[in-house]
Amino acid sequence: MSSPELLLRIAAAQRAVLAQTELLHREFGRAHSQWKADGTRVTAVDLAISAGIFRELGASFPADQFFSEELAHGDAPVPVTARFGWVLDPIDGTNNYAMGLAHCAIALALFEHGRPVYGVIYDLARRKLMHGGPGFGLLDGDQPARVLPGPLHRHSLIGFHSPVDQKHGAQARRILEAFKIRGLGSSTLHLAYVAVGILDGVIDHNVRIWDIAAAVPLVWAGGGEVQFLNGEQFPLRQFDLKMPRIFYVAGNAAVCARLREVLEA
C-alpha cells in the first residue's frame, strides 16, 4: 500500500510540472541560450523551470532533497541522505527547444531511499503528460499505456543517441545495420516512448542520471526493463554533475536480450 507521504508528493509533482508548461510553450524556439563549460546548452527557461518547480515542491516538502543539473551548487558530489528526493531535468532536449524542434520535455523524478518510484514527464511535441511508477500504473495523457510486447521485427523502431563516441563505433555500425533507428535529441523521450509503446526499445551510451531518472519508473510501470551495462545506478548514493556516462538498453525482456546480443556480437 502506498504511503500518504508518497501520494502527496505524486500529486504535487504533477501540479508542479503542469504549472510550467505555459512558459515552456511560450518561449519555444525563441529562448536565449548560452553554452556551458561542458559543451551543453542552457536557456533562461531551463533555469526558470528548475526554480519554479523546486520552489513549489520545497514549500510543501522542505525536508526533501532537490537535484537539478541547472541548479547545482558547485561541482562537489552531494550525498543522498533524505528519504525522499527529486531529480529534475527542466528541459531535456534543450538544443531542440532552442532551435524550434518540438522533441523536448520537462522530466521530474521522485526518489524514495535512492530509488526512482515515480516519474512525471511533459512531452512538448505531443502536449501530453506521461506519468507513473511501479504499483501506480502508467498514463500517457489520460490513457493507460504499456511497453510494446513481443520480439523485435523488421518494422521495430529503436531510439539511439548521437553523436557516437569512437570507442562505441563498431557497436553503432551493427545497430544501424540491424534496426530502424530514431534519434530524437531527447534521452528522456527515447526512454519514455519505450514505456508508452511508441518505440520498441532504446540503446544509449551517453546519458547521466537526470536524463533518464523520470523515465525509468515509467518503463518499469509499463512492464519493461532498463538494463544498465556499465554498473547499476540505483540506489542513488550521491548527485554528481561529473558522474560517468550511463550505458543502457531498455524495452521488454526479449527486446533487451536482442539489443545486448547485437552489442556483444
Positions of the model-derived regions?
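Acidic beta-strand-loop-alpha-helix segment within the catalytic core
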Residues: L108-A192, Q238-A265
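Active-site-adjacent structural elements in enzyme catalytic cores
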Residues: R15, A59, D75-G135, L139, ...
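N-terminal subdomain of lithium-sensitive/metallo-dependent phosphomonoesterases centered on the IMPase/IPPase/PAP
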Residues: M1-I91, E264
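Residue-level signal for inorganic ion chemistry
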Residues: L24, D46, L57, T94, ...
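Oxyanion/phosphate-interacting regions
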Residues: M1-I10, Q14-R15, R173, A192-A265
